[in-house]
């Protein structure tokens, strides 16, 4: 039994012996190298890398440009037009077939939308408006061109 007692005492502590647990000091783990992340930018055409802070031109990238032609019949359709603008699509709105009050409300709603998005709204004809997001630039004016060519 002497061997079995030794075996027991080796693996199982006797009740008489006190058990102390020593804390092992951990060595700090080496830090992993940070990966480069792009910072969010208001301008969609440039990406700034975190570590190097270099500006990378994205002018070579192709963005699909879409234009939406809309002729809303009720004010409730204005939200759908705003969603197109949020998706960076140009919207041409023909308000000739809607009441004056409804047309005014739609223009007011779209004016607020393009202001919030940093875009622009322009009148291009009788009750026809061009709404553009911030990534579209419009030069000139149709009424100025018509005056110059004596079409009016």
Curated annotation (Swiss-Prot):
Gene Ontology CC: cytoplasm
Q: Briefly, what is this protein's role? A: Cell division protein that is part of the divisome complex and is recruited early to the Z-ring. Probably stimulates Z-ring formation, perhaps through the cross-linking of FtsZ protofilaments. Its function overlaps with FtsA.
What are the Basic and acidic residues biased-composition ranges?
Answer: 23-32
Keyword annotations from UniProtKB, A to Z: Cell cycle, Cell division, Cytoplasm, Septation
Q: Which family does it belong to?
A: Belongs to the SepF family.
List the Pfam families hit by this protein, alphabetically: SepF
The gene for this chain is: sepF
UniProt region (Disordered), positions on chain = 23-42
Q: Which Gene3D superfamilies match?
A: SepF-like protein (3.30.110.150)
Compartment(s) where it occurs, according to its Swiss-Prot or TrEMBL record: Cytoplasm
Per the record, the GO terms for biological process are:
division septum assembly; FtsZ-dependent cytokinesis
List the HAMAP family hit by this protein, alphabetically. Answer: SepF
User: Is the Nucleus keyword given for this protein?
Assistant: no
What domain of life?
A: Bacteria
Q: This protein is called what?
A: Cell division protein SepF
Tell me where the transmembrane regions lie.
none
Xref: InterPro entries? Cell_div_SepF (IPR023052), Cell_div_SepF/SepF-rel (IPR007561), SepF-like_sf (IPR038594)
* Organism ancestry: Bacteria, Bacillati, Bacillota, Bacilli, Bacillales
Subunit field text:
Homodimer. Interacts with FtsZ.
